[in-house]
Amino acid sequence: MNTKELIAAEIAKVVPELEQENIQNLLEIPKNADMGDLAFPAFSLAKVLRKAPQMIAADIAEKIDASNFEKVEAVGPYINIFLDKSKISADVLGQVIAQGSHYADQNIGNGRNIAFDMSSPNIAKPFSIGHLRSTVIADALANIVAKQGYKPVRINHLGDWGKQFGMLIVAYKKWGSEEAVKANPINELLQLYVRINAEAEEDPSVDEEAREWFRKLEAGDEEATALWQWFRDESLVEFNRLYDELGVSFDSYNGEAFYNDKMDEVVDILTKKGLLQESQGAQVVNLEKYGIEHPALIKKSDGATLYITRDLAAALYRKRTYDFAKAIYVVGNEQSAHFKQLKAVLKEMGYNWSDDMTHVAFGLVTKNGKKLSTRKGNVILLEPTIAEAVNRAQAQIEAKNPNLPNKEAIAHAVGVGAIKFYDLKTDRMNGYDFDLDAMVSFEGETGPYVQYAHARIQSILRKADFTPSADATYSLNDVESWEIIKLLQDFPRIINRASDNFEPSIVAKFAISLAQAFNKYYAHTRILDESPERDSRLALCYATATVLKEALRLLGVEAPDEM
């Protein structure tokens, strides 16, 4: 029970007219610390109790059980509550020390599955910064729900099917060289893709030729299938190397092609339920009753299936395979209309579990304010970006700590962590402008800043040769340590807020606040000086490092012990 819950519970005993949750929502943090740690305004009770707010405040202050608090006093219409800092700090530090990285673990999920549709790069195209957002947001959310007791299922829904393969086959047959592709597969395939798109803008017949090759691929043509498989295999080797660098793994790589033989069932169900209508030769599902203006296009007039048909097949397969409690689609904001249609069609098919599906959208990454585009060759590739971030991290580590052992491994953790953290600290619906200098900086609200705070604490603990005892009681009541204690106590609530809002930035911002609070404490407090509080101060350091490391782990970022 956190302090707000504790206060609300005590006030509710005195004022049964208000729900405990309402009381909790009304609690305020006074602007002046002399007015207490939290305050409850009595205005909302005036009408119900037919008394002046000042009298109500005085009544509550007199009747409330103050044994859990330092003191409770009425000031005008407010009940000001002063928390017992020594008692709370002892409780919080005791919990963190006893539970370690399991502090804030919960069993809300009770082992149920949550399926994450994530990353989903396109085969034969390089992995760009644009794909990073889906990958790291979903991976962080998967870690967060695992901490709540759910079992995340990470599904990489590869973009391994579609007209773009027709384009690529046309380009390869026109200009491609097997040796060039084998020597540098992704880069060579990208050049071919950009070149054929430029030609298609000038010559509409290229589009028709690409469509024809894709139709052959759908029909199982031997040459088309062999080229497609080769492009896919080469791309996956490259992608997996990058996923290893990012520290991200998947439970399934079933992409679009996996559902080729599973779409007929979708069309059959829609037909049997009388949901398909003809529109200009195409087969559609009308969704006007859901407030969706455009019908869902299931089959084109030439008989080709569409993206939504494939996603319907995928949803059915995943429900049967994983029996998910929730299915989370971490996909860009521009796909929001598609996911509204997807859920509505499933609802029409009679699958009420579609209510458990959520599109977790996110904003775009730009460069100098401009949208990135693989087709136009305006793209920031992830592999060279990681290499540059690691180099910059290593240069800063060399300057700060030239004799540090394992410099390369630590630079990798800092460089990769910097890129991931910068993405995750941004509210996901906001885009951000790519700025490697800002990402890798050790100052400001960055991953390296948080990692450095953790490494600094580990250095203090090594100097002191301190390991907390599970039997000891550690308590503090000074202002600087209290700021840290409040944050540590809030960590379980942070986890739940991040999960409820599908918002990893809540955890990232918490980590920044905790690092800032510790750095302020470090500047004001002589931690290692001999004094009665020394062990409690070191216990605070230990607890802070534990929670910082766990917050970073949830974000998929390493916390080196030295930097």
Curated annotation (Swiss-Prot):
Superkingdom: Bacteria
Motif position, 'HIGH' region: 121-131
Subcellular compartments: Cytoplasm
Keyword check for Phosphoprotein: no
EC number, UniProt record: 6.1.1.19
PANTHER family, per the entry: ARGININE--TRNA LIGASE, CYTOPLASMIC (PTHR11956:SF5), ARGINYL-TRNA SYNTHETASE (PTHR11956)
Name the UniProt record assigns to this protein: Arginine--tRNA ligase
Upper taxonomic lineage: Bacteria, Bacillati, Bacillota, Bacilli, Lactobacillales
